[in-house]
């Protein structure tokens, strides 16, 4: 299924962006509100089976919205990571928070990182940002090389909040915000770095432990936030 795919991380990102529709954005693509939109976590192989059941053939094909599967940011990152690794490009999923959504200053988000041998660094890419996303969010940067500060790993967000650089209430998803949420994402990020991805819905019971946090103050880290 991957044999006819391009080798460019940018082209692979574009392909993934056309395979999935984020459930929270379905209405923007003209998907009827009564449409069943499964949100179960899927491995890359299962996602490919579903993709082929909707539109058999090359993954390069331009897909109408009704021929795409439904998912979340985690699913985009899994597919992009899978394709990059197939091309022997070192890649990994990261869990943290993005600053380019309008729902929360630091919105819960998953992306993919790949190693650039030319630049000798890990490059962060967001496969969710298709043309519709970029237009509605006013995004002008390259989604295959996220500028510094547009995405923070969970660990960076933890340091920023604990150091007083930003209110913990500005970090999370919807009404679920604060240190407990950041810590959940720290566990998720650690696990995906160990090749043990967890469900985006797995909180590990962390909110119940919120009262146990230490009040130790940390010095603010040097993190540049994109304006």
Task: List PLM regions with ranges.
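His-Asp-centered catalytic microenvironments across diverse enzyme cores
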Residues: 13-14, 18-22, 31-33, 97-110, ...
């Amino acid at each position: 299924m991957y044999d006819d795919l391009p080798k460019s991380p940018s082209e692979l990102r574009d392909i993934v962006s056309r395979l999935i529709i984020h459930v929270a954005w379905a209405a923007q693509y003209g998907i009827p509100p009564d449409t069943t939109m499964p949100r179960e976590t899927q491995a890359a192989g299962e996602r490919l089976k579903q993709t082929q059941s909707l539109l058999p053939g090359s993954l390069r094909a331009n897909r109408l919205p009704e021929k795409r599967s439904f998912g979340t940011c985690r699913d985009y990152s899994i597919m992009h990571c899978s394709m990059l690794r197939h091309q022997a490009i070192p890649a990994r999923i990261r869990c943290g928070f993005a600053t380019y959504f309008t729902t929360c200053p630091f919105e819960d988000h998953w992306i993919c990182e790949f190693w650039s041998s030319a630049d000798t660094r890990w490059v962060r890419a967001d496969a969710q940002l298709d043309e519709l996303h970029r237009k509605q969010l006013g995004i002008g940067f390259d989604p295959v090389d996220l500028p510094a500060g547009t995405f923070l790993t969970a660990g960076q967000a933890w340091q920023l909040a604990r150091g007083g650089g930003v209110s913990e209430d500005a970090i999370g998803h919807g009404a679920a915000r604060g240190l407990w949420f950041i810590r959940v994402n720290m566990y998720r990020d650690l696990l995906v770095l160990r090749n043990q991805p967890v469900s985006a819905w797995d909180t590990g019971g962390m909110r119940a432990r919120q009262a146990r946090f230490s009040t130790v103050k940390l010095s603010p880290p040097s993190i540049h936030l994109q304006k």
